[in-house]
Curated annotation (Swiss-Prot):
Its main location: nucleus. It comes from the Eukaryota. Residues 281-301 form the ELK domain. It comes from Arabidopsis thaliana (Mouse-ear cress). This is Homeobox protein knotted-1-like 5. One of its GO terms (biological process) is cellular response to ethylene stimulus.
Length: 383
């Protein structure tokens, strides 16, 4: 048994839905359900959960008879497939779990059964937690900040996915499965690094270029993008032409959102959240890259501070000499040699201390000397 490309999906993906659009192709003649099937939660870790037309057509009615589809359960998981073998349908029964935590029984056969057995084997594998963590890490890199709680909310439904495949007991080749799991984890880790590089480098370059264009436009026209309507043509005929060209591609697009319509460059909520995320990622990368250098510089500064700070008992001797010689605080070489013997410091340290001490007391000495000269002048004037 080999894990081909069709089975490389994560185990949290639900089984594919089958929609019979052709009237000539009829659905399987029998539906073996022990009870009326109910709606199931959205695909696990499948963030875009917009309800499509095909999903609404396949959604079963509620138990109260209402045919409306619940907004919170956009997809109905159908464990029903057909496998014809000599005119008979070969089926197996597995358990499923609906949104209310109740168990439902469905019929699975053929390729659906094989795919479900692969997913069950992956769920029971020891590396499944590591695989799921790598998959979620890739999602968190490229997901906007305001959408991250949706990932956590879907992770809380992990027990329902495990319960859904718990009844399958198909044995898979362990060596082949180990090889698949290990290579898939390595692939996801590499993909995460590529996503981080894209978010930190390419996306930031695009945002910066967009900001520069915005500033250039404002400097040339004097109008900020938020004040304008994003239109570059003033004639109604030209405006209608732009709208018709946009509608040719997609009826849901308008001139403000289309690049060919030169819409406003005002960032959306997701773009702002992406910018914040890019800034945080860049700040984190810078901290990690320069962390060792910052620590070395800090240690060097602290070492110099510790080296420049003299012990308290030695400074007391120097301060005492300063007070006794405050009128002329310039020690001679003999005084310095005596201070070296008394304090145990080096001659360079004593010289630096006196230089700094004179700088600290420079203002006080100048003020006292000026007052002394004024007093002398007054005395000489009176005499």
């Amino acid at each position: 048994m080999s894990f081909n490309s069709s089975h490389l999906l994560p185990p949290q993906e639900d089984l594919p839905l089958r929609h019979f659009t052709d009237q000539s192709q009829q659905p399987p003649p029998q539906r073996h359900f022990s009870e009326t099937p109910s709606l199931v939660t959205a695909s696990f870790l499948n963030l875009p959960t917009t309800l499509t037309t095909a999903d609404s057509d396949l959604a079963p009615p509620h138990r109260n008879g209402d045919n409306s589809v619940a907004d919170t359960n956009p997809r109905w998981l159908s464990f029903h497939s057909e496998m014809q073998n000599t005119g008979e349908v070969r089926s197996e029964v597995i358990d499923g779990v609906n949104a209310d935590g109740e168990t439902i029984l469905g019929v699975v056969g053929g390729e659906d059964w094989r795919s479900a057995s692969y997913k069950a084997a992956i769920l029971r594998h020891p590396m499944y937690e590591q695989l799921l963590a790598a998959h979620v890490a890739c999602l968190r890199v490229a997901t906007p900040v305001d959408q991250i709680p949706r990932i956590d909310a879907q992770l809380s439904q992990l027990h329902t996915v495990a319960a859904k495949y718990s009844t399958l007991g198909v044995v898979v080749d362990n060596k082949e499965l180990d090889h698949f799991m290990s290579h898939y984890v390595v692939l996801l880790c590499s993909f995460k690094e590529q996503l981080q590089h894209h978010v930190c480098v390419h996306a930031m370059e695009a945002i910066t270029a967009c900001w520069e264009i915005e500033q250039s436009l404002q400097s040339l026209t004097g109008v900020s993008p938020s004040e304008s309507n994003g239109k570059t043509m003033s004639d109604d005929e030209d405006d209608n032409q732009v709208e018709s060209e946009v509608n040719m591609f997609d009826g849901s697009l308008d001139g403000s959102d289309c690049l060919m319509g030169f819409g406003p460059l005002v960032p959306t909520e997701r773009e702002r959240s992406l910018m914040e995320r890019v800034k945080k990622e860049l700040k984190h990368e810078l901290k990690q890259g320069f962390k060792e250098k910052i620590v070395d510089i800090r240690e060097e500064i602290m070492r110099k501070r510790r080296a420049g700070k003299l012990p308290g008992d030695t400074t007391s001797v120097l301060k005492e000499w300063w007070r006794t010689h405050s009128k002329w605080p310039y020690p001679t070489e003999e005084d310095k040699a005596k201070l070296v013997q008394e304090t145990g410091l080096q001659l360079k340290q004593i010289n630096n201390w006196f230089i700094n001490q004179r700088k600290r007391n420079w203002n006080s000495n100048s003020s006292t000397s000026s007052t002394l000269t004024k007093n002398k002048r007054k005395r000489t004037g009176k005499s």
